[in-house]
């Protein structure tokens, strides 16, 4: 199973929880992490390959004047996977999703003459493009099984890039993927991308927290599931401590800032720094648990020096 995930720097913290849950339930051979740095020091699993989007070829990093700047550069990377990755197919999962079960059956799907597999997007967004016949075909791009070989062969990547450069879309990458691939989609059960718009189902294998209602924001639908894996990750690592701090949550997509009290995970040195900077915002450091979690020791309290 080969996975691709894209994450901006302010989501690295949440990415660690997603990876923990993914590795817990699945045999994964490689994870391509598209990030804004050369690596994330505390994510040391050998299955992870970091790709710094700022060092990709210029033709990928260059924005068209028609690109919708409401979304980050990271949002468009999916349209370039066929050019960047030397793979036959990949499974893309958004950084705000959590894998809660084994998804090998999803990976094993033979796409044949289909460009990708995804879950139908219900509700108000299914017909926002105004394209005849699109209502029952529009998919959410948060979880995609992508046939890179076919996309290269039929030059669908070129078609997507051309649309990005010549027309403005409400949801740029998701819209162009739907427009270009609308007749080449294998439709999946919503258990593989359970959202508020695709349907929040009890037997979901991948829960996708869309819009501002993220899993790490307490009170969001099914946030207790995200926190279940978050807490497991803490318990199974010997390199973590908890601290309390004020965090400023900045979601550019909805243009507001929220201050919340929350527990974040940092190394001991970082914890000492936080204690002297109580107003520090955007704490996004976490350590990846050991590969063999059964051998990891729980953190122990240090005795006070007399």
Predicted regions and their residues:
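N-terminal anchoring/stem segment of glycosyltransferases
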Residues: 1-60, 210, 229-239
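A glycosyltransferase accessory/donor-loop signature
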Residues: 1-7, 17, 33, 141, ...
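Short, polar loop motifs at secondary-structure junctions
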Residues: 35-40, 55, 122, 191-194, ...
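Active-site-proximal specificity loops/subdomain of glycosyltransferases
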Residues: 45-83
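GT-A fold catalytic core of metal-dependent nucleotide-sugar glycosyltransferases
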Residues: 56, 74-124, 136-138, 145-146
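Short, charged, surface-exposed secondary-structure boundary motifs
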Residues: 58-65, 125-130, 197, 216-219
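Short Gly/Pro-enriched turn/cap motifs at secondary-structure boundaries
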Residues: 70-71, 133-136, 166-169
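Terminal and domain-boundary regions
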Residues: 239-306
